[in-house]
């Protein structure tokens, strides 16, 4: 299929720049994946679509305040560093701006010396392998010095950094939030659990590649970025049991769906305890083996994420739903409204 087939007109003013005061006050567009029927609801109405014996699968990754501002020791020049992926020990793959100022052996100081970095290797496109030195616990130092790496389409500063974390975020490692989960509060999760719905966690650390535009014409030629995922034995067993007894598996976010489908795709549809790196690309024609329904946000035109949701329903239904969302003034992208495809 052509990437152009997944385009739609989106007025810029519908891109949500700030989160709503109440996480659960978002709207919820409900799409019947087979018939294409659309209903306009509120996010708390998700309760009526979840039943006893179903599984709600959420990604418990935690966004790192991964954007750092420092100075080049040799000249005092301002350097911006974005943490991308942890390597061995205290070494990280990073994106440095301006990259030309930091060559192999160059050093950077952050926050009055609380954190220092040495460049071990130069990569293409501004990438650098930096080794960090610090006292104490790295993630605590990051919390003090780092900023949230908000998506490029968010132009406003975030007043409360916790609003770019889910309420159940636990496992450090993401460069971006699994945004479908931002709509949940602890109270709503408790109400869902009280209905007899099993709440199950997976981990997938979201990389910045999630914002990278698709730069090929044909979807068959697209190469996905890879992201780390993990599923525990307990979680795998619980999901398998729910599927065996006829319950629905409802994934919260495209990251949860990619984790489950990665594992199911090479275990004959079953889920097993597993961790690794996935570059699964789900687009129309894909046969889902683990997931029945999806709670997600409204995605960018021509993105791999709109291709994924088109695979769960079909391209015609999804584009009709997205055009409806534009007409009804839904809020789009990370801080926007939600969609339930079932």
Curated annotation (Swiss-Prot):
Catalytic activity as recorded in UniProt: 7-aminomethyl-7-carbaguanosine(34) in tRNA + S-adenosyl-L-methionine = epoxyqueuosine(34) in tRNA + adenine + L-methionine + 2 H(+)
Main location: cytoplasm
Gene3D superfamilies, A to Z: QueA-like (3.40.1780.10)
EC number of this enzyme: 2.4.99.17
Keyword annotations: Cytoplasm, Queuosine biosynthesis, S-adenosyl-L-methionine, Transferase
Domain of life: Bacteria
UniProt GO cellular component terms: cytoplasm
Molecular function terms from GO: S-adenosylmethionine:tRNA ribosyltransferase-isomerase activity
Pathway per the UniProt entry: tRNA modification; tRNA-queuosine biosynthesis
GO biological process: queuosine biosynthetic process; tRNA wobble guanine modification
Places the protein is found: Cytoplasm
NCBIfam families: PRK00147.1 (NF001140), queA (TIGR00113)
Family membership: Belongs to the QueA family.
Function text: Transfers and isomerizes the ribose moiety from AdoMet to the 7-aminomethyl group of 7-deazaguanine (preQ1-tRNA) to give epoxyqueuosine (oQ-tRNA).
Quaternary context: Monomer.
Protein name in the entry: S-adenosylmethionine:tRNA ribosyltransferase-isomerase
Organism: Listeria welshimeri serovar 6b (strain ATCC 35897 / DSM 20650 / CCUG 15529 / CIP 8149 / NCTC 11857 / SLCC 5334 / V8)
